[in-house]
Structures are given as structure tokens and as C-alpha cells.
């Protein structure tokens, strides 16, 4: 939308109502562009959220698939904003939907050999990495997010639940005692020459 971007989706909603579409359809036409920027409101209905999610994932997979992923400060297709929107939508829906599965499903809509190999995995990793800035805005340490992502889960709602729980635990005396005990065990193992277990 190059002219009147503030009206994006609004005209479509009016057309949908004029054509006799259900109100839920008209609402989804308007609200699937939400959130439009950081901190913007989310869609008010499951239908609008579903379309918003599908639209963002299609864009991410399509642009990544042709090798136009953001680099450095360049993000001409606003993919960072789109990825954060995907996270916010999935967390808000509080669903068990798996980001990896959703990216794979979006990639399947493209003809064979259209996308670069591992496009879905690249989109998944990129989107999960956007959690970092999202949590920084909430003053949650990046180490908390890394600890959660080290478990291999890719469902944003589950990631958010675990980050919230771990962040709450991290400030307790029990967490401090656990960290101290872990450090002592690591020092003992290092001095004895034994390899540490693969614990992140």
C-alpha cells in the first residue's frame, strides 16, 4: 500500500460488508494486517489472527526462499517486524502450534524447487531469534531465553511460558543456590579431568 497506508484493510472490510460477507470475514480482512508496528493491537478474533499468521508466514517463507533474508541493517521487506508479529500472534493465541511445522506447511504451498533448501528451518530460527529483542524490551536476560531454546522447543507460546517461569525462578534464593552448586560440581569435574555432561 503506497497511498493512504493508514486505510490498509479498511477499504477491503467495507467491500466485504457491501458484498454480503459475514461480519467475521469483514473483520478478518481489516484486522489481518495487525499488528502493524511494535506495540500495536492484535486481531480481535481467531479468524483474523489465523489469516494474519498465514500472511506473515507466507511472506517470510517466500522472501527467505529466494535468498532475500535481512542482512545487517537492511530489511526492505520488513521481515523483522513480520517475525515479531508471528511471535506475538502465537503467544496471544496461547496455542500448541509449532513454529517449525507452520513454516514447513507454508513452504509446501510453493511449487517444487522454487525455494532454497532449508528455507523453513531458516525462517523458524530467524523468527525464534526475534524473541531476543522482544524480551529485552521486558528486561528479561537473553541467557534465560537461550536456556529455554536450548531444549529444542519451537512453539512460541510454550517458549513464552517457560521463559516467564524461568525468569521468575532466576531471582529466588533457590536459583542462586542451584547455580552455586552447579558451579562447584563443574569445578570438581574439571579438576578431576572428567568431561562434563552435555547440559546447556
Describe these PLM feature segments.
Residues 1-200:
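Amphipathic alpha-helical "coupling" segments that flank catalytic cores
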Amino acid at each position: 500500500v503506497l497511498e493512504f497506508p493508514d486505510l490498509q484493510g479498511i477499504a477491503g472490510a467495507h467491500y466485504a460488508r457491501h458484498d454480503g460477507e459475514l461480519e467475521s470475514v469483514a473483520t478478518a480482512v481489516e484486522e489481518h494486517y495487525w499488528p502493524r508496528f511494535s506495540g500495536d493491537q492484535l486481531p480481535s478474533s481467531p479468524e483474523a489472527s489465523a489469516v494474519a499468521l498465514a500472511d506473515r508466514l507466507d511472506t517470510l517463507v517466500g522472501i527467505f526462499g529466494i535468498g532475500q533474508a535481512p542482512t545487517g541493517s537492511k530489511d526492505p521487506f520488513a521481515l523483522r517486524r513480520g517475525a515479531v508479529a508471528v511471535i506475538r500472534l502465537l503467544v496471544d493465541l496461547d496455542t500448541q502450534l509449532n513454529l517449525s511445522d507452520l513454516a514447513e506447511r507454508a513452504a509446501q504451498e510453493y511449487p517444487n524447487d522454487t525455494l532454497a533448501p532449508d528455507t523453513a528451518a531458516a525462517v523458524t530460527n530467524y523468527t525464534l531469534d526475534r524473541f531476543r529483542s522482544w524480551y529485552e524490551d521486558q528486561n528479561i536476560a537473553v541467557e534465560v531465553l537461550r536456556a529455554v531454546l536450548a531444549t529444542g522447543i519451537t512453539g512460541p507460546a510454550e517458549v513464552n511460558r517457560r521463559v516467564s517461569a524461568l525468569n521468575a525462578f532466576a531471582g529466588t534464593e533457590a536459583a542462586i543456590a542451584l547455580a552455586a552448586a552447579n558451579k562447584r560440581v563443574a569445578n570438581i569435574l574439571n579438576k578431576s579431568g572428567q568431561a562434563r555432561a552435555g547440559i546447556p
